[in-house]
């Protein structure tokens, strides 16, 4: 029941309720909610608050779009129990950086967020038209529309 190795979980959990069970049982040291799975910014903030009360850190999982990634970045900047965030924009399709103008690139493990309104992204309509949506399958077998 006890280990010196930190336990992290939560990539595939939905909403604050399963996270609450983990927190109540003191079953993890690090929670990894995913903004696309766990219910968006508001739900991630609630999960973070619940975890903070029990001295559990947050390391958000991120496999969604650049919009989801930057929303998580803004949240991480504002939660005291933030530890680290999964960031793999270098693996995104290169056109994402043209479509989502202002998406931050990491340097030495850090990103600098824009102080522009909203998420700080501008969508380039001309670039979007060059990449019409197509259907793809996600890890859970569901269909996604992506560009």
Give residue ranges: language-model regions.
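Shared catalytic-loop signature of beta/alpha-barrel
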Residues: 1-110, 114-117
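Extended hydrophobic packing segments that form well-structured cores
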Residues: 119-147
């Amino acid at each position: 029941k006890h280990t010196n190795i930190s336990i992290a979980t939560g990539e595939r959990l939905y909403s604050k309720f399963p996270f609450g069970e983990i927190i109540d049982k003191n079953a993890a040291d690090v929670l990894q909610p995913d903004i696309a799975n766990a219910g968006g910014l508001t739900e991630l903030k609630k999960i973070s608050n619940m975890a903070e009360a029990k001295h559990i850190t947050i390391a958000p999982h991120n496999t969604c779009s650049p919009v989801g990634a930057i929303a998580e970045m803004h949240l991480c900047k504002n939660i005291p129990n933030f530890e680290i965030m999964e960031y793999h924009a270098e693996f995104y399709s290169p056109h994402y950086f043209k479509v989502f103008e202002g998406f931050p690139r990491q340097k030495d493990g850090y990103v600098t967020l824009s102080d522009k309104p909203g998420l700080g992204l501008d969508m380039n309509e001309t670039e979007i038209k060059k990449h019409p949506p197509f259907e793809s399958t996600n890890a859970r077998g569901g269909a996604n529309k992506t560009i």
